[in-house]
């Protein structure tokens, strides 16, 4: 009777070892397929993308690392070989240039969200401007904009001032920020009398700033956020999974809660 019992124990031990081996194999396989994606993105997307990435990571083995900043410098870094998998810009120009130089895959290009441009003032300001025309008043000293050459928000702001015939009259009052969040900080700290930022940035600032005017849509190029995967990406499949997730219902809910506008037409882009 002792021999069969010993044999049974050996079989149980072998089964346990096999089960443990299978668990370890599956764990290692899952880890092997988990990629860490590097995304360079416009800083105005920081709050929304950070929240979306948490949801994405909870549903995926992939991880996301962000490099936030002004779209111009981020695109320049990519042109110079920065190890990035995907790029989300606050304007089309930067993505156009990356595609022309062969750095980005045009077939992956898509519009993620839209935004609006607003004029904000410090909430605590006394007798602040109430419109774009008011910016010419003597009581208005400094007006903050993003640097038009490198910051899309600054580009849209300058287009607006030019189309409203105010750019020349306001040139001596303008203070340039390195990115749209720096412009927002200037207003929050009451270092300027007004600033031009995205509606989403004004929302982030809460009750520290007040929106006094919205730029007419006809006064500037549409504020689109195009995303694209780079041709040098080391995790192209994972990057595509993340870009696809950005157009999912959970991601859309987060974008809307942050004040972004969803595209109403086709999201894929084909540009000359």
Question: Which residues make up each language-model segment?
Answer:
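Bacterial N-terminal signal peptides
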Residues: 17-29
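Exported/periplasmic ABC-transporter solute-binding proteins
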Residues: 34-68, 72-82, 87-92, 96-105, ...
């Amino acid at each position: 009777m002792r021999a069969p019992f010993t044999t049974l124990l050996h079989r149980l031990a072998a089964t346990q070892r096999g089960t443990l081996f299978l668990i370890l194999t599956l764990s290692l396989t899952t880890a092997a397929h988990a990629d860490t994606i590097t995304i360079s993105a416009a800083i105005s997307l920081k709050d929304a993308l950070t929240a979306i990435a948490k949801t994405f990571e909870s549903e995926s083995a992939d991880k996301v690392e962000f490099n936030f900043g002004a779209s111009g410098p981020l695109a320049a870094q990519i042109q110079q070989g920065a190890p990035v998998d995907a790029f989300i810009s606050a304007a089309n120009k930067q993505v156009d240039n990356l595609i022309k130089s062969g750095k980005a895959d045009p077939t992956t290009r898509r519009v993620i969200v839209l935004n609006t441009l607003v004029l904000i003032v410090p909430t605590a300001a006394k007798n602040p401007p109430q419109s774009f025309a008011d910016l010419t008043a003597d009581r208005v000293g400094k007006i903050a904009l993003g640097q038009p050459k490198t910051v899309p928000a600054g580009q849209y702001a300058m287009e607006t001032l030019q189309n409203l015939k105010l750019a020349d009259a306001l040139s001596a009052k303008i203070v340039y920020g390195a990115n749209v969040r720096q412009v927002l900080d200037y207003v929050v700290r009451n270092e300027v009398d007004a600033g031009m930022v995205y509606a989403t940035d004004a929302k982030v600032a809460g009750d520290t700033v007040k929106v006094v005017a919205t730029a007419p849509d006809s006064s500037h190029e549409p504020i689109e956020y195009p995303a694209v995967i780079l041709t040098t990406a080391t995790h192209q499949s994972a990057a595509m999974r993340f870009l696809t997730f950005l157009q999912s219902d959970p991601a859309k809910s987060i974008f809307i809660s942050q004040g972004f506008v969803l595209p109403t037409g086709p999201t894929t882009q084909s540009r000359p």
